[in-house]
From Swiss-Prot:
It is found in: Cytoplasm. GO terms for biological process: chemotaxis. It comes from Caulobacter vibrioides (strain ATCC 19089 / CIP 103742 / CB 15) (Caulobacter crescentus). InterPro entries: CheB-like, CheB_C, CheY-like_superfamily, Sig_transdc_resp-reg_Me-estase, Sig_transdc_resp-reg_receiver. It catalyses: [protein]-L-glutamate 5-O-methyl ester + H2O = L-glutamyl-[protein] + methanol + H(+); L-glutaminyl-[protein] + H2O = L-glutamyl-[protein] + NH4(+). The keyword Cytoplasm applies. This is Protein-glutamate methylesterase/protein-glutamine glutaminase 2. Belongs to the CheB family. One of its GO terms (cellular component) is cytoplasm.
Amino acid sequence: MRVMIVDDSAVVRGMVTRWLEEAGFIIAAIAVDGGQALRKLADTSVDVCLLDIEMPVMSGLEALPKLLAAKPDLRVIMASTLTERGAEVTLRALDLGAADYIAKPSANKLGGADLYRKDLIEKVRHLGARAARPAPPQAAPRPTLAPPSSDPAGPIEAVVVASSTGGPPALRRFIAGLGADWTSPILIAQHMPPGFTRTLAQMLDPISHLTAREAQNGEPIVPGVIYVAPGDYHMTVRAAGGGGPSIHLDQGPEVNYCRPSADPLFESAARFWKGRVLGVVLTGMGRDGRDGAAVLAKVGGTIIAQDEATSVVWGMPGAVANAGLAEAVLPLDQIGPYIASRARSVA
């Protein structure tokens, strides 16, 4: 697997080169800015590019669309800072076609560099493996449908969503596909650090008539709202004093190496709404959401998984599909309309 490193810091270039070479990757090219990266890409075979956002001459955000125009199948990982501006620029980059991002460790965070190294190696390995596969056929993939595990338990009172790598752009398209009549609350566990999730909610807010916001502990869950789990917090559903659903946030142990994790969200939603909740598992690495989907399916809830062809990484949805938990395995743009149609049929 061939990697290009683009960063204006000699220290970062040297450190990342050493890490990736020790992990068995080939460093095909190294560049100090976006312009140099474009010139090197013209005569170098590259599978994955680690692209810094803030650089002189040509920034990562400026270079990204040019790199993808030159090599459409290039998998780009944006290297971002854990700041509000870093979050905004990163989400813009994901919309422009970046496959993923990695948050640079803060200097005062104990063990930050080691976690960064492990995260980087995992992302490069998964994205590089995807880039090495043959391109999917141009024809639209056919959806895989399975019979429902049980009869619909009544109207869909809520939707819970799991997403990770490639999730922000996928969430935009999924929400847009629900249509103007959708009112049931949507609860999202997207793997992102603190600060990024607030920016994600702001990005999702204008997509539809629904109000999107970062969830707050104890607030009631009401129709017409999209709740995004804050970074570094698990989000679950609990009964409020009057018996209605409310948001509970906690910093319990990571689940599937994640916080927020989809499994606690799905499991708590299954306990509260039983079969009247629908789970959606979108693109992402790992298997987060699989165990929660199993709990949800056991009480009669419905699970929809994104298909492999439209996923950046078919880890999470693949785990659900391969476990036989999904009623439907669909291309991304079919998920929203499918759910909206299903909701109308049981209303």
